[in-house]
Amino acid sequence: MEQLEVNGKKYKILKLLGKGKGGYSYLADDGEQTIVVKQIHHEPCDYYQFGDKMQAELRDYDRLHKIGIPMPRLIDADVSNERLVKEYIDGKTVYEMVLDDTLPANCIDQVKKMCEVLYPANTNIDYFPTNFILQKEDASKLYYVDYECNDYMEEWNFENWGAKYWSKTPVQNAGIYGICGKSSKLKSEC
């Protein structure tokens, strides 16, 4: 795959960033800027039930944007081809920083600040560490690069689920393989 088209605009694919429950994310170029093109897929997922994935992406983006979660700007959406164009956030994932023992304390502080606005809005996000990038340009800003969110459930909040994967522990390593599969290329999202 060399190019993807979104609403008539062509994007040169540079590389696969990652595969998640809902789609493949590609680093791409439109001749002016580097962006992310996400192609929705319909592959089965044992642990998650989907409705209309494209509508869920758009609805979740709107919900998180209103709550004020730092995330990549949605640039374009091609509903018929099930593709999104998102701002590219250059930097390391929390997953990469945990493995390198370079995760700054301010990342934990920032995800907790996200929780302070998410929980009162009855919302959880996917706290898996591949979904968070510390921006290279401004190393003090953490972004949630997925748009997925769900109604709040205590068992799936950061403290009870996500935090287990934000440290180098057997739980994190088991979780990485249990959720993503051993052959996964963990980059920007799992």
Where are these regions (language model features)?
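Protein kinase catalytic-loop region centered on the HRD/HxD motif
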Residues: 115-123
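A short, low-complexity linker immediately N-terminal to eukaryotic Hanks-type protein kinase catalytic domains
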Residues: 1-13
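Conserved structural core of kinase catalytic domains
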Residues: 50, 69-108
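ATP-binding glycine-rich loop module of kinase domains
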Residues: 10-55
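C-lobe/activation-segment region of protein kinase-like
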Residues: 122-124, 135-190
